[in-house]
A protein has these predicted regions:
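A short acidic, Gly/Pro-enriched loop at the edge of an enzyme's catalytic core
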Residues: 107-119
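A short glycine-rich, Lys/Arg-flanked "PGG" loop and its adjoining helix->strand segment in the class I
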Residues: 134-146
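Class I SAM-dependent methyltransferase SAM/SAH-binding core
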Residues: 52-108
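C-terminal lobe and adjacent flexible extensions of AdoMet/dcAdoMet transferase-like proteins
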Residues: 212-220
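A short SAM/SAH-binding and catalytic strip from SAM-dependent methyltransferases
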Residues: 118-131
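Conserved class I S-adenosyl-L-methionine
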Residues: 1-44, 60-64
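Short glycine-centered segments of the SAM/dcSAM-binding site in methyltransferase folds
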Residues: 50, 147-149
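C-terminal alpha-helical "lid/dimerization" subdomain adjacent to the S-adenosyl-L-methionine
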Residues: 4-7, 151-194, 198-211
Length: 220
């Protein structure tokens, strides 16, 4: 039975759930494995970590991270997405005793303060408008433990001609004005506004996707 989606101003991809596992690798062409490895390395998950994945889609990357977690030590990852069809598919394909999925909007997380050791997000923030970007990062900060890590991989200010061409074309082709905010390079500023340390730009892909990492300071 398909789960109901959560109301949100962000763009949900219920319609894409049946083919999402086929489409995502096409978007990253031949660099899917390299991209996944870069996100994993930035996150550096430990066996006892509790991790949150924002905008997890059908949970392929969520599941990859879960493989190093040990539920006997309390290790687990929870993927959230506002699209009920995505979470339905994720639970059916990839749910386990260390990999959980919930229908939830990133701007309104149903978790207590300081619940997670790390928060990750892959190609999610370009689907939501500026106010939800800001709210989602504030929520990520709230649910992170002091010293916790935030890893965001998403569209960023283009660094090459081709990157600029693809990112601007995507904005108009997919009718997503939210992409323009990413292209302007707003994500690092929004992370800092939310209270995180200065974001590091760890790796770039295709001239317009960046893997960011920042932290919640130990004293907060």
């Amino acid at each position: 039975m398909r789960l109901a989606s959560k109301p949100t101003k962000g763009r949900t991809l219920d319609y894409a759930a049946p083919v999402y596992d086929l489409l995502e690798p096409l978007c990253l062409l031949s660099r899917q494995a390299e991209y996944d490895a870069a996100v994993f390395s930035a996150l550096n998950p430990q066996p006892a970590d509790r991790i949150l994945d924002l905008g997890c889609g059908t949970g392929a990357q969520t599941q990859q991270v879960s493989l190093v977690l040990n539920p006997q030590l309390g290790g687990a990852i929870t993927g959230i997405d506002a699209a009920g069809a995505m979470i339905t598919a994720a639970r059916e394909k990839r749910g386990s005793d260390r990999c959980f999925f919930e229908v939830m909007a990133a701007e309104k997380l149903d978790f207590p303060d300081r619940s997670f050791d790390a928060v990750m997000s892959s190609l999610f923030f370009h689907h939501i408008p500026l106010d939800l970007k800001r709210a989602s990062l504030s929520e990520a900060y709230r649910v992170l433990k002091p010293g916790g890590t935030l890893v965001v991989a998403d569209m960023d200010r283009p660094t090459t001609f081709m990157g600029g061409l693809v990112s601007h074309a995507s904005r108009w082709l997919f009718f997503q004005p939210q992409i323009a905010e990413n292209i302007r390079g707003v994500l690092p500023e929004l992370m800092s506004e939310a209270g995180f340390t200065q974001p590091e730009r760890l790796q770039h892909f295709f001239g317009y996707i960046t893997v960011f990492r920042c932290r919640k300071e130990e004293t907060r």
